[in-house]
Curated annotation (Swiss-Prot):
Protein name as annotated: Xaa-Pro dipeptidase
Catalytic activity, as annotated: Xaa-L-Pro dipeptide + H2O = an L-alpha-amino acid + L-proline
Biological role: Splits dipeptides with a prolyl residue in the C-terminal position.
Superkingdom per UniProt: Bacteria
Pfam families per the UniProt record, alphabetical: PepQ_N (PF21216), Peptidase_M24 (PF00557)
Keyword Membrane set for record: no
Top-level EC class: hydrolase
Keywords: Dipeptidase, Hydrolase, Manganese, Metal-binding, Metalloprotease, Protease
Amino acid sequence: MSSYSQLFAQHLDTLQQRTRDILQQQGLSGLAIHSGQTHRIFLDDQDYPFKVNPQFKAWLPVLDNPHCWLLVDGVNKPVLLFYRPVDFWHKVAELPNAFWVDFFDIRFLTRPEQVADHLPANKQEWAYLGGHLEVAELLGLGQPNPEAVLNYLHYHRAYKTAYELECLRDANRIGVRGHIAAKDSFMAGASEFEINLAYMKAVGQGANEAPYGNIVAINRNAAILHYTHLSAQRVPDAERYSFLIDAGVDVHGYASDITRTWAWRRGEFADLIAALDAQQQEIIEEIKPGRRYSELHLQMHHRLARLLQATELVDMSVDEMIHTGVTNVFFPHGLGHFLGLQVHDAGGFMQDERGTHLSAPEQFPYLRCTRVMEVGQVFTIEPGLYFIDSLLEPLRLGEQGKRVNWNKVEALRPYGGIRIEDNVVLHANGVENLTRQAGL
C-alpha cells in the first residue's frame, strides 16, 4: 500500500466518524452527496466549465465528472455511483484506477436518472448535499442541504487530515515551480498573457483546472486586487516597473494560493517589497494556538503603520493611522483565510459546530476569518501595500490627507502595489510554511 493510500485510509476514517456524529445528532440515516451537473450557457448549446461540489471532493479526488454520487452513512463502505455514459461527442471519464478506488463500492451509471435505482428504501431519511435541489426533490430525498449538517461539516473542515496536508504540500511544491517560471518570464520581457502561459506550462494545469483565475498584473494593474484581464500587450523595458502574480494549483481537489511581487529594477519599490516580506514572515511567527485570527490581522495593521512611518509615506502615529482608517487605504483586504478544498475554505466565521457566526470587525469588513487559531488549521497570510486610486482620492481630500507624503505616493503609483502570500499550517510545535519550504 502506498503512503498516499495509507494517508487516504486515515482521511476516510475521519470523514466516516464526522458523518456518524452528525447523522446521530440529526436523526438521519445517511448523506447523498451529488458531484453536480453541468450548467448550460444561456441561449447556447455549450456548457460552462464544470466545477465539482466541494462536499463531494472532500471524499475523493473525482473533480471533472458530473452526475456522480456518494452514498455515505458513516458505517458501511461508501458507495460511489460513477457516471460513464455512452457518448461519442465528449470524452467519457476513465475507469477509476487510483490510490482511492479500493475504499469505495463503485457502481456505474450510464444515464443520470439511474441513480434512483441505487438509493436506499429509506431515502426520506437521507439528506441531499448538492447544488441541484430539483434533483433531490425528483428523487424523493428527505432533506436538501440541512443547515445543521452543513455547519457541522464546514466547521470541522478547518481541521485538516494528514492526507489533506500532503495534498496542500504538493499544491505548493507545484505552484512554486509556476511562480518561478512566471518571474523568469516577466524578467524576459513577456506580456501578462505570455507570463500566464509560462505559469500554466510549468504547473501542468490550464485555466479550467486552476483553483481560481490567475492574477498576473504588471505595473498599475497590481493595484486591482482581483485583476484577471491578462493583457497580451508587451510593456517596453523603460516602462516596466513591477509584477504581481497571485496564482495557485489544484492537487486532488486541494488548492494552493500563493502571491509574490517583483520589481523590474532596484530602487525604492524593491526595498518596499523586501520590507513587507520581512513583516510578513514576522507576523507568521506570531501565529499561536488559542489566538484569534482577527487579532493577528489587527497586529498586521500595526506593522503596516510602522512601515508607512519608516518609509515616510505617512506622518501619523500608529494608533492614529489605524483609528482613522488610513492603514485600510493602503491595505484594504484581510490578512488571509482558511485554505483547503476551496481557496476561501469554509468555516472561517464559525465559532462552533452549530455554526455560530462571528462577523469580521466593523473596522475590517473584508477579513475572511474570525476563528480562534488551532492545531491542524491551514491559513493564507497575505499582507499587502497598494496605491489604489479610488481609495487614495478620498484620503487626499480628507483631514488625514494633510499627513500623507503625496510626492512619494505619486512616485509609487505606477508600481500598483505589493502582496506577499504564503500558505501555512499550525502545528502543536510551531508553524509549517508550505510555500517557503517549497523554495519561494
